[in-house]
Amino acid sequence: ASYLDGLLLCGGSTAQFAFVAKRELAEQRIAGRFLRRLGAHFVERVDPRGGAADAEALLTALAAGEWLVIFPEGTFGPEPGLRPLRMGAFVLAARSGAELLPLAIGGTREWLRDGHWLPRRSSLRVEFCAPLRAQQNSWLEAIRLRDATRAALLQQLEEDERVPRFG
């Protein structure tokens, strides 16, 4: 993952979609303005009540036919490998019945690493994985979607699992 992932999707697609981003980005001068112009949905990640209200708003957007782009890693760092996927996107897919289309974005971390602002040459690519759809509205189904997405991304990216560090 990289700062470039969203820009790559914007520049390489004619589809109309909205990003889902952490609420803190709305307060950032450049990123907030850019994301608001793209019609982003900002979500609360800390306060459960705010997060629940945001989830309902996202379900309404999905029911209205809006395409949402969610980066399920939630964040990124300089370390290689795929981070654990957060459950939000998969719970939304299970609750709404919306189709999930995993996208594997490669090369952006090498091109612009976390904490660096000078790009390095790298091949960029976006791989579309097979679409997934929930078969029922349940937590176990959301877990199945998460695990299937993770397996598809790891296969396309040819990256290792990233083992989280504790302490």
Model region roles, listed by residue range:
Residues 52-167:
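Non-catalytic C-terminal accessory region of glycerolipid acyltransferases
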Residues 1-48:
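Catalytic core of membrane glycerolipid acyltransferases/transacylases, capturing the structured
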